[in-house]
């Protein structure tokens, strides 16, 4: 097995060990969960406001009720939180929690260090 393949395998096995103690399990439940994580983190990194309604619309192949449930679960598990800003208090924005931001950045740093 090549070194890069071995590194990737070790990385994956380490991630699976964390699966029940971190966001790994939640965001790997389905492609839609992973897609939701990427949308929220991309908006956060670009400093863009992402409303709950916009997130529901952008999650392809996921019904609006299922999208709402996924967002609620992510908030309940303290990965995301909802914030009301501006004059329209009916509009809620989805933001990652600081703990999740730290976890996500650590995940990206580890991925970048893998050589292929």
Give the location of each predicted region:
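General nucleic-acid-binding
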Residues: 1-7
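Short alpha-helical segments that sit at the start of domains
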Residues: 8-39
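Amphipathic alpha-helical dimerization/coiled-coil segments
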Residues: 19, 105-116
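Short helix-to-turn junction characteristic of helix-turn-helix DNA-binding domains
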Residues: 40-44
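Short acidic, hydrophobic short linear motifs in intrinsically disordered regions
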Residues: 46-58
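Short amphipathic alpha-helical interaction segments
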Residues: 61-76
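A short, conserved structural fragment
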Residues: 75-85
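Short, cationic-aromatic polyanion-contact patches
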Residues: 85-108
